[in-house]
Amino acid sequence: MNGYIYIITNKSFPGWVKIGVTEDIKSRLRTYQTSSPLRNYKIEYYIHHPDCYRAEKTIHEKMKPFATEIKNEWFKCDLELVKGRVEESLEPEENVLTFIKRGV
């Protein structure tokens, strides 16, 4: 799928990051937001990728040591570490893409 790999954080859960994929960043963030103060998610980074499911799978493999559950997209680690693992996981020709820092 042509789409985006994104990294989400939440101040209520410091030190945790979520790595996921979507076709539409803003729509995806809206699915997380509710009136609960614990649902204040922020998209920290996203990057467009022509095969985001394949790339996400590779990134999740690299992040396994930081996962608490096998099929979970949440990882206990530093945001900069995750960003580095995403960059490492891209094919060399894909690595020309850059992260876009957004507070969506």
Please place each PLM-identified region on the residue numbering.
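Non-catalytic accessory segments flanking enzymatic or RNA/DNA-binding domains
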Residues: 1-104
